[in-house]
């Protein structure tokens, strides 16, 4: 988005009454769907929403449906996919704008895909991007505080997610171990699936239960049993067991047998930028997208498992005045789990990067503050010894950094790591 367009949108939001803004978004959603001839009527669209795990869950669902013999498309914050063709999502948007998304679904329908798996964001829901899309199923990964300032509180954030479930009345897939389970279970659905590990969901919820037993996880992978089938994933962490269960529940709602789910999930080696091990030698280096306190804590917990040496982290926080509340929380988590902490810039937008760094580092007593992200990564790698583990969070597989005045520069945490280690060896 150009600086001029961004300015005009900001002014419009301030001068237009709230109902007019909502009406504008609704009409734009209708116009986009009509222009593209309502493509979702020709395909089955699976919507995946939640705070964390949407991209991984969407890719897991796509892998299972493909394994089952269907032609599948994906719209995620990582990539777009139609059958075997894949291209990177460079928009920095979890859920594309109305016309982009409807045009994508039109292509999906025209290329005879049976399914489209779409990430659904709270911002997208607030702007009616989900409207006039006929969703076969709505799946919830989890819900933790995020986008609090833009929504005006957690209850409003949860309510935004709820609008998606209210709009999709066919199949609902809900994380039964999430504290918000019963809120989402209250929305009417033809069929409801509840998944979990801890079996904490209430029997009052009328739903088919997809549960995991004998769940074990580490940085090297995870395993569990469900419906009498043993699953062994190469993806790390307990959070990926939850992501897998969500994907299994969606697949089972479409009649896919458990064995096909197992074969597909066990074939997934890595998800780009999601606890991705980019180097393994004397020490290990992980790159992860974690941008919320919940996802950051889970990443650190997983990274500490089986660790002989020290855990060294590089982290930042997004600028633009967004979710400032979480900056000290993330600094505290880094201090709690990591032996050495490097706080740096992430995507400052128009905000002073040094102020963002200060708000994080003030909660981490021994944090080293380095504004230049490349230098911070180099310093962390230089500090790593035999048996240590370095985890770099916040960017994942993103290929640009957002600076002031709408400027973007090419970026890759992974490439910076590999370039440095290649030169230092």
Residue ranges and their predicted role:
Residues 41-43, 109-111, 135-285, 308, ...:
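Acidic, Mg2+-coordinating active-site environments of NTP-dependent enzymes
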Residues 76, 120, 176, 196, ...:
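Short loop/edge segments at beta-strand edges and connector loops
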Residues 76-79, 228, 269, 394-396:
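Short, small-residue-rich loop/turn micro-motifs
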């Amino acid at each position: 988005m150009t600086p001029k367009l961004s300015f005009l949108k900001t002014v419009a939001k301030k001068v237009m009454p709230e109902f007019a803004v909502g009406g504008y978004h609704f009409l734009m959603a209708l116009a986009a769907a009509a222009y593209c001839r309502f493509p979702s009527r020709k395909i089955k669209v699976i919507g995946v929403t939640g705070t964390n795990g949407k991209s991984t869950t969407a890719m897991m669902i796509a892998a299972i449906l493909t394994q089952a013999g269907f032609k599948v498309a994906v719209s995620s914050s990582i990539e777009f996919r139609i059958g075997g063709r894949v291209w990177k999502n460079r928009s920095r948007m979890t859920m594309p704008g109305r016309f982009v998304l409807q045009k994508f679904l039109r292509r999906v329908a025209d290329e005879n895909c049976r399914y489209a798996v779409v990430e659904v964001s709270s911002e997208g829901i607030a702007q009616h991007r989900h409207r006039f899309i006929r969703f076969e199923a709505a799946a919830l990964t989890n819900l933790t505080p995020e986008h609090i300032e833009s929504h005006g509180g957690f209850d409003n954030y949860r309510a935004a997610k709820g609008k998606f479930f209210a709009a999709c009345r066919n199949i609902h897939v809900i994380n039964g171990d999430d504290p918000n389970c019963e809120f989402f279970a209250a929305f009417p659905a033809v069929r409801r699936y509840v998944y979990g590990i801890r079996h904490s969901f209430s029997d009052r919820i009328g739903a088919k239960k997809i549960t995991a037993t004998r769940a074990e996880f580490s940085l090297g992978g995870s395993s569990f049993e469900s419906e009498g089938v043993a699953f062994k994933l190469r993806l790390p962490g307990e959070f990926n067991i939850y992501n897998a269960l969500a994907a299994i529940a969606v697949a089972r709602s479409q009649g896919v047998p458990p064995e096909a789910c197992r074969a597909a999930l066990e074939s997934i080696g890595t998800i780009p930028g999601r606890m991705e091990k980019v180097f393994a030698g004397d020490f290990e280096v992980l790159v992860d997208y974690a941008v919320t306190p919940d996802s950051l804590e889970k990443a650190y917990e997983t990274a500490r498992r089986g660790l002989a040496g020290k855990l060294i982290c590089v982290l930042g926080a997004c600028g633009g005045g967004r979710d400032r509340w979480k900056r000290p929380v993330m600094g505290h988590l880094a201090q709690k789990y990591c032996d050495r902490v490097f706080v740096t810039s992430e995507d400052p937008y128009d905000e002073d990067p040094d102020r963002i760094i200060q708000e994080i580092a003030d909660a981490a007593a021994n944090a080293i503050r380095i504004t230049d992200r490349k230098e911070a990564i180099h310093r962390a790698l230089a500090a790593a010894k035999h048996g240590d583990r370095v985890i770099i969070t916040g960017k994942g597989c993103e290929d640009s950094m957002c600076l002031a005045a709408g400027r973007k520069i090419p970026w890759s945490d992974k490439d910076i790591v590999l370039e440095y280690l290649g030169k230092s060896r």
